[in-house]
């Protein structure tokens, strides 16, 4: 009696090829995990400017952080950027109030999620007040559910994350294109300018608040003449794009007879996107005072002239505001004329 035995033959060549391919992919993946892509390093380089140290973000812990949404556009940009930076520094998830989203989202491509009011009301928040400058204690803020308060708007909070902050405050395409189309149409004595300087003149309530409350001044005609002349001496045929919440005053006090000044802003504080976009799309900035001008200069990059020393030494404003924390070290200050305050 013969026994029948059946043999199964596995194809040798395909099997060896499969093992070789799988081994190659596995070891390649292991090597890639140990390498940092060069584009990541390049993207981080701008964020290292002018900051003494780069704090490492902690692993994200449980809980959530938010911040008060108070003030107009410049204030809320400062609040957003501060929340973004401090939450990351402390390893917490960050959420913004709906009011902040309504202010910023129509203009910028922000990414922080919204914490709706119904949810926020059920959270046991711990309020944590911030000064308008970075302090060491803010690196170790206790609490899982923290609501940051105050009016923080200082590069000392977030400049180590400059590349990320610029990404958060990227203009929507239609906002940017409208501003760029306007700028492309400008001419200086018939020629297209090669250098665009945004000029923001803060007037409005500050005209009365600064002298009567803060023992300070707003920018005058002489300051603006000096600032414009600084750029005229440095660049060939620049054009100055003026935005203000006091455009009538600007037309009366800024000399446009050379043909290099354009009064472009609408001064509408309720819809600031157009004015802000125009300023950020310029190469350089002249600002006076206020967070609107500070942020326009920060996003534009380039060279910035600002009004310096615009309060008396005993001003109560200096208890809540540090000029060195508001203006980047590389920006150039022109001292204000305080003589009107000394006449009283």
From Swiss-Prot:
Which Enzyme Commission number(s) are on file for it? 2.4.1.69, 2.4.1.344
Q: How does it sit in the membrane?
A: Single-pass type II membrane protein
Tissue specificity here reads: Expressed in brain, heart, lung, intestin and kidney.
CDD domains xref list: Fut1_Fut2_like
The question of whether Glycoprotein is a record keyword is answered with yes
Kindly report every residue range on the membrane side named Cytoplasmic: 1-7
Recorded catalytic activity of this chain's protein: a beta-D-galactosyl-(1->3)-N-acetyl-beta-D-glucosaminyl derivative + GDP-beta-L-fucose = an alpha-L-Fuc-(1->2)-beta-D-Gal-(1->3)-beta-D-GlcNAc derivative + GDP + H(+); a beta-D-galactosyl-(1->4)-N-acetyl-beta-D-glucosaminyl derivative + GDP-beta-L-fucose = an alpha-L-Fuc-(1->2)-beta-D-Gal-(1->4)-beta-D-GlcNAc derivative + GDP + H(+); a ganglioside GM1 + GDP-beta-L-fucose = a ganglioside Fuc-GM1 + GDP + H(+); a neolactoside nLc4Cer + GDP-beta-L-fucose = a neolactoside IV(2)-alpha-Fuc-nLc4Cer + GDP + H(+)
Q: Which GO terms describe its molecular function?
A: alpha-(1,2)-fucosyltransferase activity; galactoside 2-alpha-L-fucosyltransferase activity
A GO cellular-component term linked to this record:
Golgi cisterna membrane
Query: Which stretches are transmembrane?
Result: 8-28
In terms of InterPro entries, this protein maps to: Glyco_trans_11
Q: Which UniProt keywords apply?
A: Glycoprotein, Glycosyltransferase, Golgi apparatus, Lipid metabolism, Membrane, Signal-anchor, Transferase, Transmembrane, Transmembrane helix
Residue ranges in the Lumenal topological domain are: 29-344
Q: Which GO terms are recorded in the biological process aspect for this UniProt protein?
A: carbohydrate metabolic process; fucosylation; glycolipid metabolic process; protein glycosylation; regulation of cell adhesion; regulation of endothelial cell proliferation
Q: Where in the cell is it found?
A: Golgi apparatus, Golgi stack membrane
Answer yes or no on keyword Cell division.
no
Q: What is its main location?
A: Golgi
Q: In which pathway does it act?
A: Protein modification; protein glycosylation
Specify the glycosylation sites in chain numbering.
189, 255, 283, 309
What is the stated purpose of this protein?
Answer: Catalyzes the transfer of L-fucose, from a guanosine diphosphate-beta-L-fucose, to the terminal galactose on both O- and N-linked glycans chains of cell surface glycoproteins and glycolipids and the resulting epitope regulates several processes such as cell-cell interaction including host-microbe interaction, cell surface expression and cell proliferation. Preferentially fucosylates gangliosides GA1 and GM1 in the antrum, cecum and colon and in the female reproductive organs.
Q: Which PANTHER family match?
A: GALACTOSIDE 2-L-FUCOSYLTRANSFERASE, GALACTOSIDE ALPHA-(1,2)-FUCOSYLTRANSFERASE 2
User: What's the protein name?
Assistant: Galactoside alpha-(1,2)-fucosyltransferase 2
Q: Which species is listed as the source?
A: Bos taurus (Bovine)
Its taxonomic path starts at:
Eukaryota, Metazoa, Chordata, Craniata, Vertebrata
**Record gene name:** FUT2
